[in-house]
C-alpha cells in the first residue's frame, strides 16, 4: 500500500513537471510570435537575420534572441539587457537596430532560467525581477557572454553591453564582474556599489534623460568615484527627455534626442569594439 502511494505521488509529480514544462514552452512560443510580429513592423529587421536560441547554464536554460548583420567579416557583439518589465517586444528591435549597424546583438530573457516563462504583465515582471539575486544574474550573463563569444560570426573578445532602466544598472554592475568587456553602455540605470567600481575595466558611457532626477542625482557622485578609481566614464544628459526615453511611449521618445543618443552610442561602440 505504501509503495502504491509512493508511486502515485511520483507519477503526480512527473505529470506536474511535464505540464509545467509544456506550459513554459507554450508561453515562450507565444512571446516569440508576439516579438516576431513586432519585428515585422521594423525596417531594421529587413536587413538583418534574427533567431531564437536556448543557452544552457548548468541545469537551467536561458532563452535569448540573436540578431546578425549582413556582412562578410566577423562582427563585434553587444549583449542587450532588458528593463525591469522583462523581455518585451521592444528589446529584440534594439538588437535588430544594432545588427543593422554591423553588430551581432543578443537579448537574453533573464527571467527564463529562474522561472521558465514570460511574465503575464508588468506587475508580475517587477515581482519576478525582484526575486532574482545578483549572483544568478551574473551567472546568466556569463553564460550569454560565453555563448556569443563562441559564435563563428563574432570577433572574439570584442563584446560590449547595453542595458535600459533596471538593465542599465545590470549593465553597469556586470562591468564590475566581467573584466573582459570592452564597452559598457548604461541607459538611465543606477550605478554599482562604490567598492565594486574599482573592478571595472571597460570604458562606460551613460545615457540619461533630463527629467529623471532619481537617477541623475547619482551622476556627480558616480563620476567622481569613477575618476578617482582611474576609470573611463562619460555621460550625456538629453534635454526634454525622461526616464526610459529610448523606448517608444516614454517622455521624449518621439523627439530628436533619441537619434542623437543612438548616434552617440554607436560612435562609442565603433571606437571601442570596432566596426
Tell where the protein language model's regions lie, with residue ranges.
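Generic structural signal for well-ordered alpha-helices
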Residues: 141-145, 219, 223, 266
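Short beta-strand/loop motif that positions the catalytic acidic residue
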Residues: 200, 206-208
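Primarily recognizes the serine-hydrolase "nucleophile elbow" in alpha/beta-hydrolase
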Residues: 141-201
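Serine-hydrolase catalytic machinery in alpha/beta-hydrolase-like enzymes
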Residues: 39-46, 52-150, 247-249
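An N-terminal hydrophobic leader/cap segment in hydrolases
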Residues: 4-55, 62-65
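C-terminal catalytic histidine-bearing segment of alpha/beta-hydrolase fold enzymes
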Residues: 227, 232-275
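Acidic catalytic loop of the alpha/beta-hydrolase fold
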Residues: 211-216
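Active-site loop/turn elements of alpha/beta-hydrolase fold enzymes
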Residues: 103, 110, 189, 238-240
